[in-house]
Curated annotation (Swiss-Prot):
Pfam families: Humanin
Signal sequence annotation: none
Protein keywords: Cytoplasm, Secreted
Annotated family: Belongs to the humanin family.
Biological role stated in the UniProt entry: Plays a role as a neuroprotective and antiapoptotic factor.
The keyword Cytoplasm appears for this protein: yes
Induction entry: Down-regulated 6 hours following staurosporine (STS) treatment and up-regulated 24 hours following STS treatment. Down-regulated 6 hours following beta-carotene treatment, while it is up-regulated 24 hours following beta-carotene treatment.
Major location category of this protein: secreted
Gene Ontology BP annotations: negative regulation of execution phase of apoptosis
Taxonomic lineage of the native organism: Eukaryota, Metazoa, Chordata, Craniata, Vertebrata
Tissue: Highly expressed in testis. Also expressed in kidney, heart, skeletal muscles and brain.
Organism the protein comes from: Homo sapiens (Human)
Protein name, as recorded: Humanin-like 3
CDD domains found in the cross-reference section: humanin
Family annotation (InterPro entries): Humanin (IPR028139)
Amino acid sequence: MATRRFSCLLLSTSEIDLSVKRRI
């Protein structure tokens, strides 16, 4: 369960990073 939560966090962070890069 912990690993799944970590993977979800990584996915969310990657999505945020992509959105930030798009803004720039």
